[in-house]
Curated annotation (Swiss-Prot):
Organism, scientific name: Vibrio parahaemolyticus serotype O3:K6 (strain RIMD 2210633)
Gene name of the encoded protein: nhaA
Example GO molecular function: sodium:proton antiporter activity
Protein topology in the membrane: Multi-pass membrane protein
GO cellular component: plasma membrane
Top-level taxonomy: Bacteria, Pseudomonadati, Pseudomonadota, Gammaproteobacteria, Vibrionales
Name of the protein this chain belongs to: Na(+)/H(+) antiporter NhaA
Role, per record: Na(+)/H(+) antiporter that extrudes sodium in exchange for external protons. Can also transport lithium and potassium.
Effect of pH on activity: Optimum pH is 8.5. Activity is null at pH 7.0 and increases as the pH increases from 7.0 to 8.5.
Gene3D superfamilies reported for this sequence: Na+/H+ antiporter like domain (1.20.1530.10)
UniProt family annotation: Belongs to the NhaA Na(+)/H(+) (TC 2.A.33) antiporter family.
Any one biological process term the GO annotation gives: regulation of pH
InterPro entries, sorted: Na/H_antiporter_dom_sf, NhaA
């Protein structure tokens, strides 16, 4: 039994599978006699914040820290290091964010409250998408994995910018000042070639608290900390950035993201009507993910190649690109996160229907994306 559990957690797809299980359990509990207990637990206050708040603002900051680390590594020595390798996934990512947002706006342009959710279908759940791709094992070319990873990382970076610019509340000048000072201290530590992680974590904790109180979403502190961690260690030392990235990954994949899914996917269907489910808000999200993502990613990718701006990565074709573009319609955790920012404190009903739209679009995209990859990839494993 222990060997079975150990082998499961070694699977590339394990994180995505756990996300699905956590979301399914949450939905089941929320619509059972335990539903009130579930909601009561999430709204229990611990050290001045609810459990839900700690998960969404606290633990998710660690997830965004991991994103910051991954983006920095890819920019300095990975798939985004050179213009030639970065331009193709970057163009694809722009299309993949623009088209879903436009579809959502087309559906909800006449609703001044619903329009604030325009960024919900622009996100891609990197863990879920990579997990689905991993189910196909070595049939997937390495270049296609790199393309999806680079695209999703750029997408995540875009989401970070969107949150900072469009989902920020009333600002506290004093808290912002402390945040800017702490940011300066972090990058001063980097400039002084401090490679011990403890000083970064202490200053980072103060930064997180300052950002939490500033009106800017606290998870953005995680990205700043990630960018400040040095890539190179002193002579004879391991890379601090890679060490932290390696250490955080299992906690994020197998702990934080499933916990986030459990806390946010538990939607009570009581009072949910078919007319509400087919209204402009959930339809705009579901179709934004299901149609907007592949439309934007594929059309921008195709245009970039045909115009000579970028080249297709070696070993993959446009059938593969289209399959991946459908897979990127899995918004799930990132889309739910943006929904909580857009509607969480404004309209619980909007938030409920938004999450149902996310689940409909993401689930369909996962099934279709897997099927398209299955039929478009070589039948035999790649070397």
């Amino acid at each position: 039994m222990n060997d079975v559990i150990r082998d499961f957690f070694k699977m590339e797809s394990a994180g995505g599978i756990l996300l699905v299980i956590a979301a399914a359990i949450a939905m089941t509990i929320a619509n059972s006699p335990l539903g009130e207990t579930y909601q009561s637990l999430l709204h229990t206050y611990v050290f001045g914040m609810s459990v839900s708040h700690w998960i969404n603002d606290g633990l998710m900051a660690v997830f965004f820290l991991l994103i910051g680390l991954e983006v920095k590594r890819e920019l300095l020595e990975g798939a985004l290091k050179s213009k030639e390798t970065a331009i193709f996934p970057a163009i694809a990512a722009v299309g993949g964010m623009l088209a879903p947002a436009l579809i959502y706006v087309a559906f909800n342009a006449n609703d001044p409250e619903a329009i604030s959710g325009w960024a919900i279908p622009a996100a891609t759940d990197i863990a879920f998408a990579l997990g689905i791709m991993a189910l196909l094992g070595k049939r997937v070319p390495v270049s296609l994995k790199v393309f999806l990873l680079a695209l999703a990382i750029i997408d995540d970076l875009g989401v970070v910018v969107i949150i900072a610019l469009f989902y920020t509340g009333d600002l506290s000048s004093m808290a912002l000042l402390v945040g800017f000072v702490m940011t300066g201290v972090l990058f001063m530590l980097n400039a002084k070639e401090v490679t011990k992680l403890t000083p970064y974590m202490i200053v980072g904790a103060i930064l997180w608290f300052a950002v939490l109180k500033s009106g800017v979403h606290a998870t953005l502190a995680g990205v700043v900390i990630g960018f400040a961690i040095p890539l190179k260690g002193k002579q004879g030392e391991h890379s601090p950035l890679k060490h932290m990235e390696h250490a955080l990954h299992p906690y994020v994949a197998f702990g934080i993201l499933p916990l986030f899914a459990f806390a946010n996917a538990g939607i009570s269907l009581e009072g949910v009507s078919m007319s509400g489910l087919t209204s402009m808000l959930p339809l705009g999200i579901a179709l934004g993910l299901l149609i907007g993502k592949p439309l934007g990613i594929f059309s921008f990718s195709w245009a970039a190649v045909k115009l000579g701006v970028a080249k297709l990565p070696e070993g993959i074709n446009f059938k593969h690109i289209f399959a991946v573009s459908v897979l990127c319609g899995i918004g799930f955790t990132m889309s739910i996160f943006i929904s909580s920012l857009a509607f969480g404190n404004v309209s619980p009903e909007f938030d409920t229907y938004a999450r149902l739209g996310i689940l409909m679009g993401s689930t369909t995209a996962a099934v279709l994306g897997y099927a398209l990859l299955h039929f478009s990839l070589p039948k035999k494993a790649q070397d």
